[in-house]
Amino acid sequence: MKETGIHNKAASISTSGLKELSAVFYNLGPARLYEETIRRGEAELSAQGALVARTGQHTGRSPKDKFVVRDANTEDHVWWDNNKPMTPEAFELLYADFIEHAKGRELFVQDLIGGADADNKINARVITEYAWHSLFIRNLLIRPSQEALASYVPEMTIIDLPSFKADPERYGVRTETVIAVDLTRKIVLIGGTSYAGEMKKSVFTALNYILPAKGVMPMHCSANEGPNGDTAVFFGLSGTGKTTLSADPTRTLIGDDEHGWGEHGVFNFEGGCYAKTIRLSAEAEPEIYATTQRFGTVLENVVLDENRQPDFDDGSLTENTRCAYPLDFIPNASKSGKGGQPKNIIMLTADAFGVMPPIAKLTPAQAMYHFLSGYTAKVAATEKGVTEPEATFSTCFGAPFMPRHPSEYGNLLRKLIAEHKVDCWLVNTGWTGGAYGVGKRMPIKATRALLAAALDGSLNNAEFRIDPNFGFAVPVEVPGVESSILDPRSTWADKVAYDAQAKKLVDMFVSNFEKFESHVDHEVKDAAPAIRMAAE
């Protein structure tokens, strides 16, 4: 077996049971991985030098094909309502078949780190069948120094073999695609999908399981730091503006997607970014756009024209087109991946019902309530071609990656907020003056002005009113922001219609929260929205 590249000889790939391979490439850099990718016909080059790969039928994650091993260790610690169980026997059989399937193949190994905090990191070894997958994950996670590689010992291993097709009957799985996670042994097996995001989220899932037991809060969020060292954390589901609002030229970007919060402050889990590129433009997002124009970046499912120019407006393969690049491709990115204790937490929502104010201040109990709710509303087309808002609740702003019960994360968040006296804000980037179709999108200029006032501390001095439906505090006046948009009801021409829409949304919140009622105390229950009909 031919082995190439720097690695710890005492912790070679054979420690994972992988033997009789034709070749193993350890820790290759971008140039070598480009050469191997092209040699193997896995991807092509854009005119600017980015590596462009297609993932075939899977252009997103396969959450319905993800399984967690249910054993004595995980039995009482995993939220089984949200995680599909796999028996240890089925996993063992699958693992043996993965090892058999790998025989005679060339494999690529990247020895990487999840977590920029030395006390709360995991050494994650990622073994891939595809060379471009090796570059992808090298871009996304934290890369150890060349010296550190010689003594690197993996604590977690991911084996990604897209050509492996799972037999549903043999392993008790759903389809030919499988993502099997053994949290006890820290092994992840990915088969039957070429979508690279599965690898990144497997490390996130492992850290989301490991860290709460150490009192560290794992978060699906972006984070940045102001010139005075004040750290801000941004929670939000897809389409709420998390990436756009945290990419602020006046602040240092700590990371765009996954972070931990512990005794030393906030730290990035990753060493790169995985940004959406559909309709990306140099005007709207210059920093992200610039990364797509250079050597080392991986473009996933981006369409190239005949001159190999990327067409970011073309969603014919998928709307979920992406680019993966190291964090240092962004000019104002943090070199350490670490920030201090957060001064502000921003929970983003895009309320397409037009009911919520553009900003509200939350108490720690309200912050826990809204964190557990994880609300946004997207606009979905109905069969008649009419579009209407659809509420989405994804607990902890990232339900698919949370192995433990949401209340564990919620209680930890609430404790840290109280301990560090963090200001919490709910920011609505959705609609004002009516629901989608009647009202208009919240002006980004207003959102940025409100956010700036929250982050610099001046918003704390504003006069606040209590929202009659949601019970949170809403500023009455903010310099540079039209006062009318601060009171959503006043922006609706039809006040009765607003009250009806507000009642509808409040009822959705209440109904969604029923499953958490028995896991929270009275203070959090009392933070629930309730209809108190406003006077004309």
UniProtKB/Swiss-Prot annotation:
Broad class of the protein's primary localization: cytoplasm
Q: Could you tell me the superkingdom of the organism this chain comes from?
A: Bacteria
Where are the annotated coiled coils located?
none
- Annotated metabolic or biological route of this protein: Carbohydrate biosynthesis; gluconeogenesis
Span of the signal peptide: none
Reported EC number(s) for this entry are 4.1.1.49
Family membership: Belongs to the phosphoenolpyruvate carboxykinase (ATP) family.
This chain belongs to the protein called: Phosphoenolpyruvate carboxykinase (ATP)
